[in-house]
Amino acid sequence: MSYARGEKIDGVIFLVEETDDGYTARALGHSIFTQAGSLEELKEMVKDAVECHFEEGERPKLSDFT
């Protein structure tokens, strides 16, 4: 998936996997990866990773894990 700088992104899908040490989250179509020891911690790490990856006007709204 590609987008032009300044273009608003509707959403990002993350593949979440359980590991021996906790959980990992990898964005599909974007170069975003993070990991954490718990799901609650992972939610915060995903939020932080998205904020770092996208500029202010491009960031998608984040919804809860389902």
Swiss-Prot record:
Domain of life the protein comes from: Archaea
InterPro entries listed in its UniProt record = TTHA1013/TTHA0281-like (IPR035069)
By sequence similarity, the record places it as follows: Belongs to the UPF0150 family.
- List the protein's name: UPF0150 protein AF_0072.1
Query: What is the scientific name of the source organism?
Result: Archaeoglobus fulgidus (strain ATCC 49558 / DSM 4304 / JCM 9628 / NBRC 100126 / VC-16)
